Swiss-Prot record:
Family label: Belongs to the UPF0412 family.
The UniProt record lists the keyword Repeat: no
Organism, as annotated: Escherichia coli O1:K1 / APEC
Keyword Cell division assigned: no
Signal peptide: 1-23
Keywords: Signal
Name of protein: UPF0412 protein YaaI
Gene field: yaaI
Length: 134
């Protein structure tokens, strides 16, 4: 009888964890090492085109100063959008969600995201983590 209760409890916990994981549609799209000098050609190319409707940026291992970002969509006309991003992100800080202009179904297939910026207040290169939400 005790083993039946243990198995039932284990299944219930597994089911709760499974449903929680499915409810979270956030994916780490990639990480970019930010150089110490201003650079305007930092690109995150997605190997598989991802449907994304908004992104978050997070700084790890140092502070970041950003001067621009663009997102490129997989389309015959190479559609792109300039993103409105914060100029500074402190270490361990995550931005609010940044919405991506989208087509009628409120989603687009993202192929590349580019950034301009650099590491500040750190001897090591900071990293910029890009999180997507579909």
């Amino acid at each position: 009888m005790k083993s039946v209760i243990t198995i039932s409890a284990s299944l219930a916990i597994s089911l709760m964890l499974c449903c929680t994981a499915q409810a979270n549609d956030h994916k780490i799209l990639g990480v970019i090492a930010m150089p110490r000098n201003e650079t305007n050609d930092l690109a995150l190319k997605l190997p598989v085109c991802r449907i994304v409707k908004r992104i978050q940026l997070s700084a790890d291992h140092g502070d970041l100063q950003l001067s621009g970002a663009s997102i490129y969509f997989k389309a015959t006309r190479s559609a792109s959008q300039t993103l409105n991003i914060p100029s500074e992100i402190k270490e361990e800080q995550t931005t609010d969600w940044i919405n991506i202009n989208s087509d009628n179904d409120n989603k687009r297939c993202v192929s590349k995201i580019t950034f301009s910026g650099h590491t500040v207040n750190s001897s090591d290169m900071a990293t910029l983590k890009i999180i997507g939400d579909d």
